[in-house]
Amino acid sequence: MFAKLLKYEWRSSRKTIATLCAVILISGLLIGSGAFAMVRWDSLTDGSEVLGTIVILLMSVCMMAVAVSCAASVFYVLWRFYKSRFTEEGYLTYTLPVNNHFLILSSLLMSALEILLVLLAAGVAVALALGIFSLCLPWKEIGPDAWNAIARALGELGNELGKHGKDILLLLMTAILAGISTLIMLMLSVTVGAIVAKKHPILMAVVVFYGIGILRSVLNVVGLITGGEEAVYSALTMMNISSLVTIGAGYALIYWLTGKKLNLT
């Protein structure tokens, strides 16, 4: 039943997520093409300032479209969570033959997946733009000595990264936990706003989110100040601990609020 619930969540949002990804990819294509045109065709800049201005404006709009689409993915998954839990659709959701844990986990997993898909699309768009722009670079003018120097520099970079493998893993773990905890904070804020302050749910959600964020920031600063020579590691450790606490406590509060306040248990 949990798999069916995930499938239902995906079917409800796949068109919107696909649209956001398409907007991002098309924007990346246009940004790369615009950069290619600006470098390759002098007529767009020297010969016709109007066309050059249009190309620059188009590239700026596309960059804004990428940023807005990434932000929209977060707002969309929160809106979907609110709609499927705290509206008329939500009452139908809670009549499904699954427990509250499955309902929360399905929303959490699908929200994370949908945001991740949009972010991956943004990464592909950046690679696409850089790839198109690289076509106008004078690769043939780069001599073998320059390529050898680049290869040596990359080799040295790889060696340095290998020496700091544990640090890289720590940073990666910090980023993953921070992303999950932020999503939990957002879902908790929506839950509190919808249940505690029905007249002003958005305002309450904003207050709760920033309240938790400020508390976590204070704890992270304390870890940085008291860390001494290992201040960076101490701060990262404190961030990971606060993220884990946020994930556990936030999930428990969401479960309790949706279960007890809506008389599900």
Which residues does each PLM region occupy?
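Hydrophobic alpha-helical transmembrane segments of membrane proteins
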Residues: M1-G90, N100-T265
